[in-house]
Regions:
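Terminal, non-globular segments
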Residues: 1-168
Length: 168
């Protein structure tokens, strides 16, 4: 049986950026077509998967750039997505050794927590929701959205495991 040749670091980085770019495109091309209250956050999946492959400083820069892409489309809440993505990416990079194992349940939990933290930060800093609408969003739609995002992340990680493996 012939084993696969070892991959270079440049090939691993190129595959990771390809995966991130595809998730970025899905966030802006597929997500608007499925416009519901509980959306899958493809960009958050990309940011989390990129953050576990990098150090906290670079993860924060990736989060900032992803947040600026989102903030450019919502001038009323400019900076809210950037702040949320930076915090989530930084924290994800810090706890990667604990949560990003080769275990499906831990990966799902990692994405759920990341999505909940992102939504809490984004909604509280954007200032768009108040009162019962805020409670409904945080208590009903955020957990549903987090579960859907985690489900998609698990499916993507299972299908494209070599692309997102942290050590590859």
């Amino acid at each position: 049986m012939v084993s696969a040749p070892p991959q270079s670091a440049a090939a691993s980085i190129a595959r990771a950026w390809l995966g991130f770019t595809l998730l970025l495109l899905a966030h802006f091309a597929v997500r608007p077509l499925l416009d519901t209250r509980a959306n899958v956050d493809y960009l958050l999946i990309g940011v989390l998967f990129a953050a576990v492959r990098t150090r906290p400083g670079l993860a924060a820069v990736i989060g900032l750039l992803a947040g600026l892409c989102v903030d450019a489309l919502v001038p009323m809440a400019f900076g809210a997505a950037s702040l949320a993505y930076v915090v989530v990416a930084f924290l994800a990079s810090r706890v990667k050794a604990v949560f990003f194992a080769d275990h499906v349940a831990l990966t799902g939990l990692f994405v759920v927590v990341g999505k909940v933290v992102f939504d809490i930060l984004y909604i509280s800093t954007s200032g768009g929701l108040r009162g019962t609408a805020l409670g409904m969003q945080l208590l009903l739609w955020t957990p549903v959205s987090a579960a859907l995002t985690a489900l998609v992340a698990i499916v993507l990680l299972t299908l494209f495991r070599p692309l997102y493996r942290p050590g590859a």
